[in-house]
Curated annotation (Swiss-Prot):
The keyword Secreted applies. This is Extracellular small neutral protease. Disulfide bonds join 99-112. One of its GO terms (cellular component) is extracellular region. GO terms for biological process: proteolysis. The gene is snpA. Ca(2+) binds at residues 76, 78. Its cofactor is Ca(2+); Zn(2+). GO terms for molecular function: metalloendopeptidase activity; zinc ion binding. Keywords: Calcium, Disulfide bond, Hydrolase, Metal-binding, Metalloprotease, Protease, Secreted, Zinc. Zn(2+) binds at residues 83, 87, 93. The lineage of its organism: Bacteria, Bacillati, Actinomycetota, Actinomycetes, Kitasatosporales. InterPro entries: MetalloPept_cat_dom_sf, Peptidase_M7.
Length: 132
């Protein structure tokens, strides 16, 4: 199992959502685990951006996640955070997917509050991290 370390300190408004997203992913996949700490592989930031929230990542644990204030008021914040974290773990967007699919993101609309990856998403992450 690979441990990927994240730094939540630059997103003080989203500490609970970040912790929840990490817990969701940690309970959903076995080949990679997330933990908060120093010398981090990736970091969370917060602020205002007309593009909304996004992940700038290599798709294998490195980079950063930006959490947009306005989008997180409109959409379920734990879902947004878990979705962006999914990018750091290697998953692409799939906006046309249903609410049950985490990587459908904002596609199903603000009424969708599901923060959990589905079976296909979980197995994809496990496969991507099978060899470290």
């Amino acid at each position: 199992t690979v441990t990927v370390t994240y730094d939540p300190s630059n997103a003080p408004s989203f500490q609970q959502e970040i912790a929840n997203a990490a817990q969701i992913w940690n309970s959903s996949v076995r080949n990679v685990q997330l933990r908060a700490g120093g010398n981090a592989d990736f970091s969370y930031y917060e602020g205002n951006d007309s593009r909304g929230s996004y992940a700038q990542t290599d798709g294998h644990g490195r980079g950063y996640i930006f959490l947009d204030y306005q989008q997180n008021q409109q959409y379920d914040s734990t879902r947004v955070t878990a979705h962006e974290t999914g990018h750091v773990l290697g998953l692409p967007d799939h906006y046309q997917g249903p609410c049950s699919e985490l990587m459908s993101g904002g596609g199903p609309g603000p009424s969708c509050t599901n923060p959990y990856p589905n079976a296909q998403e979980r197995s994809r992450v496990n496969a991507l991290w099978a060899n470290g």
